[in-house]
Amino acid sequence: MSSSLSQTSKYQATSVVNGLLSNLLPGVPKIRANNGKTSVNNGSKAQLIDRNLKKRVQLQNRDVHKIKKKCKLVKKKKVKKHKLDKEQLEQLAKHQVLKKHQQEGTLTDHERKYLNKLIKRNSQNLRSWDLEEEVRDELEDIQQSILKDTVSTANTDRSKRRRFKRKQFKEDIKGSDFVKDHRYPGLTPGLAPVGLSDEEDSSEED
C-alpha cells in the first residue's frame, strides 16, 4: 500500500515538474518516473534543471535591466526635446509680442530692458562670429605670405647661383690660355710682334 502511494506521489511530482519545464523551458525533455535504481540519475537531472532555471532567471533579469535602461534614456531624450521645443516656442512668441509693441510704440520699461539686453547679446554674438572670420582670413593671409616668401626665396637662391656660375665662368675664361695668341705666346691678341710691320703681315696674307 505504501509502495503504491509512493509511486503515485512520484508520478504526481514528475507531472508537476514536466508542466513547469514545458512552460519555462520549452523543448527540454520530460522526466520519466522510474524505480529507485534511477534515483541518482533523477537527482542529476534535477540539479541540471535547477541550474538551467537559475540561468534563465539571470538572463531575464539582465534583459529587463537593459530594457529599463533603454526606456529611461528614450524618456529622458523626449523630455529634453519637449523642454527645448517649449522654450523655443515661448521665446518666439515673446519676440513676436516685443516686435509688435515696438512697431506700435507701446513697449513697457521691462520689455524695453529685455529688448536692449537681447540686442546687446546678439551684437556680441555677431562680433564674435566676425572676429572668428577675421581670424580665419588673417591666418589664410599669413599662410599665403609664408608660401609666397618661400617661393621667392627659392627663386632668389636659384638666381644667385646662376649669377655666380656666370661670373665664375667668365673669370675662368679670362685666366685661360685660349684667349692668348697661340702663334706668339705672351703677346696681347691683335698686336704684331717686334720687328714685324703691318706691311709684312699683309704680304704674308697675299
Curated annotation (Swiss-Prot):
Record's compositionally biased regions (Acidic residues)? 197-206
Coiled-coil intervals, chain numbering = none
Q: Name one Pfam family in it.
A: RRT14
Transmembrane annotation, as ranges = none
Lipoprotein as UniProt keyword: no
Residues the record lists as Phosphoserine modifications: 197, 202-203
Q: Where in the cell is it found?
A: Nucleus, Nucleolus
InterPro entries, per the entry: Rrt14
- Identify the keywords attached in UniProt to this record, alphabetized: Nucleus, Phosphoprotein, Transcription, Transcription regulation
Q: Name one GO cellular component term.
A: nucleolus
Q: Where is this region: Disordered?
A: 178-206
Its biological purpose is as follows: Involved in ribosome biogenesis, probably through modulation of rDNA transcription.
Q: Which family does it belong to?
A: Belongs to the RRT14 family.
- Protein name (record): Regulator of rDNA transcription 14
- UniProt lists the gene as RRT14
